[in-house]
Amino acid sequence: MEDIARVNLYGQPVGTFRWDNNRQLAHFEYAESFIGKGLEPSPILMPVRQGRIYSFSDIGRETFKGLPGMLADSLPDTYGRALFDRWLALTGRSSGNAVETLCFLGKRCMGALEFEPAMDAPYGPDVRIELDSLVEVASEALSEKEEFGANLEEAKKAAIAEIVRLGTSAGGQRAKAIIAYNPSTGEVRSGQIEAPEGFDYYLIKLDGVTAEAGFRETQNFGRLEYSFYQLVKECGIEMSDCSLIEENGRAHFLTKRFDRQNGEKIHMQTLCGIAHYDYRNPRSYSYEQAFNVMRALRLPYSQAQEMYRRMVFNVVIRNQDDHTKNISFLMDRQGKWTLSPAYDMGFAYNPKGGWTAQHQMSINGKFDDITRQDLLEFARHNNIKEATEIIDRIAEVSSRWPLLARECEVPQPMIDAIMPNLKLSI
């Protein structure tokens, strides 16, 4: 079991962290060689200081696993963690600490942080990936059957190891994988190796992944998410290029990775990680706090207006899964911070559900029943110009969502169930 690990960023050592087994806590210190580089990978709570040791015992154990937020952002989320736990079971290992998890990921994390020493998780050959097999193996890897792995042939074990490599670094709850994709040929390869010519890095959300046996039919989430991507673009909100890959009646949602540019890694921090705003504590934070973080990162006014546009969109289309991991920031090699492109911008509302019955972050002190006046008050307090025009445009464009949804082949019953919940008259 690993207790000490090194952190690298942009080809240079950032620091070292040690696991305190008694306190179940990591202690991080910046490398002396990193001090004076002019880079601040976590400037709000972990500014670069010589001799300063960072540890945080008062933040959520379930989310941060005893790590500082800067490092915890690299941990797998619900789906990735499930894959990792199944891989541990398959290989006869016990669940390790957070340091061991990061060493397993090594250079395969989202963003640009890399961890050493890397565990024995080989990248696998650069071969073409068949999506139908990926869906099947992902479903088997998530199976809760006790006999999982007991009688698997070596070929299937290797396939499951591959989906673990492709899926553990991706965040969120839905089944997904990190891939290299060639839009011209439609060919899919592993996203954990250097992308061949003509390929770029994408995240694919797999349609039809279940823990049940037999053919996995479409659940239409890919088509639904793609229809909202189209709506996001029409509202003038920045989002990475997205598309659908269809096979066997299923539609997998594909989004270009914004933490990779021209094959280079880009350092990324979520609002959760950079400010320790625990996304598992619903209705504990506000959009006002997000704007305060943006000011601390010295983001320009244009990005504040962009964030306001996203906030209004979330209200109008009832994206109430708007938690602190669904806002991210990017830092380039010169240390300049920017707001990342938007992601996970779709309908998420269940009046009977504990999570999405209300917004996760408040606006003008409210998590529910947010009005136009609340949006205008927010704009006034945060010096956002043209707020009325932004609200009007997003409401008007969103009224055309059913047309976009039908063009994306979203089933009519799904459209009919969603449409009455949109706040088009705000």
PLM-predicted stretches and their roles:
Residues 1-324, 328-426:
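Phosphate/dinucleotide-binding and metal-coordinating scaffold of catalytic cores
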